[in-house]
């Protein structure tokens, strides 16, 4: 038995500009749907057989992220849930691997946001096929977390050495600028 929880949604922009419906949608899809799918598959699984779960979180799960506050927090929930569930399932032959990629070029909007980040967007983004194949390799080896790309792993490590308030400030400055470039490109006031 295996399950890959890959669904997720984000509405970039300041929290105060998000509608309650947008906030609920992020929580429903990024958290509630994942928990429901996970619980359902665990209820159906044959405990005499190996079980692998892959949850797609985000590199954002490691940081407080202005302009992506709801998304980053929802992905942090998913990371913490996955690590805890991994320990619960370990004695019963289950493993949980959490994928934490940077931007993924999956839609025109995602590509626009990656491009708005300039060089950092280009060097942190990995090909979807590459990430999928490597994620499966890591899951089969029983790894707990997979962060694709050396630059992303270095960013994760550096983020752990800096006080969270400074991380939030630096990310807010960086993402705020990228967000403004996306809004200009899309002709959104």
Go through the PLM ranges and name each one.
Residues 45, 63, 84-95:
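Active-site-adjacent segment of SDR/Rossmann-fold oxidoreductases
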Residues 38, 74:
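Active-site helix of classical SDR
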Residues 98, 119-156:
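C-terminal helical subdomain
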Residues 6-11:
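Conserved NAD(P)H cofactor-binding loop of Rossmann-fold oxidoreductase domains
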Residues 58:
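Residue(s) in the substrate-gating loop at a strand-loop-helix junction
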């Amino acid at each position: 038995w295996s399950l890959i929880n890959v669904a997720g949604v984000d509405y970039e922009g300041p929290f105060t500009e998000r509608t309650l419906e947008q906030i609920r949608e992020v929580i429903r899809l990024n958290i509630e749907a994942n928990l429901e799918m996970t619980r359902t598959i665990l209820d159906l699984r044959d405990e005499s057989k190996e079980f692998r779960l892959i949850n797609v979180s985000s590199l954002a799960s490691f940081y407080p992220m202005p302009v992506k506050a709801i998304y980053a927090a929802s992905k942090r929930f998913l990371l913490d849930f996955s690590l805890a569930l991994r320990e619960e399932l370990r004695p019963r032959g289950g493993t949980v691997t959490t994928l934490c990629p940077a931007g993924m070029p999956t839609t025109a909007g995602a590509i626009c946001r990656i491009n708005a980040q300039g060089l950092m967007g280009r060097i942190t983004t990995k090909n979807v096929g590459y990430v999928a194949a490597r994620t499966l390799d890591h899951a089969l080896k029983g790894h707990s977390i997979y962060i694709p790309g050396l630059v992303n792993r270095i960013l994760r490590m550096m983020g752990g050495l800096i006080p969270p308030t400074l991380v939030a400030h630096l990310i807010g400055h960086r993402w705020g600028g990228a967000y403004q470039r996306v809004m200009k490109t899309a002709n959104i006031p």
